[in-house]
Amino acid sequence: MSFGPSPAGFGPPPPPAWIPPTDTERALAEARARGDRSAYYDVLARVRLYYVMSREAYDAQPDRVHRVFVRDTRTGARHWELFTDGMLPAPRTDVVYSRNSLDWIADAWDPQCPPTIVVNPGTPCELALPYGPPGTTDWSHVARQAAPSMSMRLRALHVGGVLHGPVAHGLACGALLCVNNGSLWNALAWHGHGYDGERRRLREWWGITTRAEWQYHLRNLLACEASSSVWEFALSLRRTISRDFGGHVDTGYWRQAVATVIRADSEGSTVITKDGVTRTDPRPESETEARIEGVQRLIGRITRYEARMRADGILAENRYVTSVEAWDLGRASKMARWGLGARFATLAEAESAVARAGRTAAHSYRSWPDFSAGYILGRCLHFDEEEFGDWYQDMVAAHRILMSEAGSPWLNIPFR
């Protein structure tokens, strides 16, 4: 399909000085410059598009759609503005966005809608689209035939995103999830699923509905206290044995050491507190043995995951996971951004939290592969139940992308 000799709404090719923020805007600008409507529509159909929504109206009625249309100051005509993710401004408390597909936008028409949609207004990839009843426009037919891509890939902001330094390092700690979801790994000014989508994500996955609850979960993640303390107990004991005896730790010896430590701890002890000396009571033998059995089963799970990770190239031969703190720190890097998208956080708070996650990770691990292995093990202990299903396989695929693609932060940002 061609644009024809002088298509309305299209001007000269984008100026050479303009740098597209992401691969999406580059593809749109190139299609626009070629006069290729089909290619332009196809790009739009394969990404999520953002539009301004009323925060006040959503907070009052979150189960409804709240679109905001604008009026052109020059012509007085009303239109609906849509944006790709690279064109969004930094989050503000008074302006929020929702996100949806081009197909949904075609179906969302009603008689009160303006006759025109404008994509990325004021940019070299801007295009005005006629907006009418579903199925009546050429772009809506393309939207029916394509859908936003759900395949994982490495994406970055080339304009407006940090690529080096402490904040970039902290953002890269969340890169496994970003690659898995196809989101921009270095977008600190986060919009994510949109204001409504980020609120829904935090509510459904974390039970977070207020700023105080978001702060609580972020603090726990940054302190590496959100995951099971038993996981870290088992791994830290193996670290101690390896450090004391140099190198490989036999699994049988590790299991025996767990039993010895737990039994010694169960006998009771004298603890010095601010109120003086306190004696803790011994634990019942049945409780102690049950705890030993549980941790030893955990050791079996850990070693089986590690064996699979070695086979899949995540862990080098004779290497093991030193800690699962990466699971908390990687999520902290994302939680900071999710909170910003949901307007529970300010940009400064998100930046500070992301940088702190990166600093803590650099103290706990030696390299990106070490960090990745800790994150993957923590995720699998939390979700996977030794099925080696999507919870595991998705992270293996994301790890391989981050360890191989030229633009990967893990290949361009020193871990320490």
Which residues make up each language-model segment?
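Polar/charged low-complexity regulatory segments
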Residues: S2-A39, V68, D72, G76, ...
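Extended, Lys/Arg-enriched charged tracts that mediate electrostatic binding to polyanionic substrates
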Residues: Y41-L44, M53-R55, E81-L82, M87-R99
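Structured helix-beta-strand junction loops
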Residues: R46-V47, Q112
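Amphipathic, interaction-prone secondary-structure segments
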Residues: L49-T84
